[in-house]
Amino acid sequence: MTVAALALALAALGWLGAGRGASQGEPIGLFTTLPILWADSPELGSELRPDATPHWALKVFADRGTIEPLDVLTPSHLAGLRRLVIAQPRALGPAENVALDDWVRGGGHLLLLADPALTLDSEFSIGDPRRPQAVALLSPILGRWELDLLFDDRQVMGETSREVLGLETPVNLPGRFAARGQANCRLWADGLAVTCAIGKGRVVALADAAVLERGDPSGTRPRAFAGLLDAAFAAR
């Protein structure tokens, strides 16, 4: 789905611009393969049905600013943003890695969700470009920040709750970050999360994306995601 189509869908749902209680704060860039802005369904226009339920994360975003969907990461796309969420993205191209690194070092605040073994179910078949990215492939940009994303394949699948930055956060087959001894990064929950001061900017990264799944009978996900956003976007 293109950015134009996403913007149309968001406007129809009332989540773009000043709709449905959105604050007048700064825009928040969103770069993701997860079905947050659209329905995980091959049916055309399914997210615009009157009975369609918007993803709960849209309200969390709207409480903090307006969503700016991104298809690519370039200097021109990032220039008007100070806040960015990258959630289980596709692999970045070389120029995108440079643009993102420059943006963070110039003062950008990034929340990154990088899942090495995504457990989210999808109606799209394996190989369909609309299917969420199964494995985070972010070694080049993480390497620029002297981080490694690791995965223990001996884990048993199943959702659990872990405390991250003081937040009870649902995870499922999470990875962990390893730092290379740099003083500007701090690991949390045995590496499940990491916070880094990079240049004038900040990165808060979580090695799992289960927090953004739609199902949430306990209300844990919105609280955890809101806390992660606030940690990433707080002034330095």
Residue positions per predicted region:
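Short, surface-exposed patches at the edges or C-terminal ends of soluble domains, predominantly
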Residues: 1-236
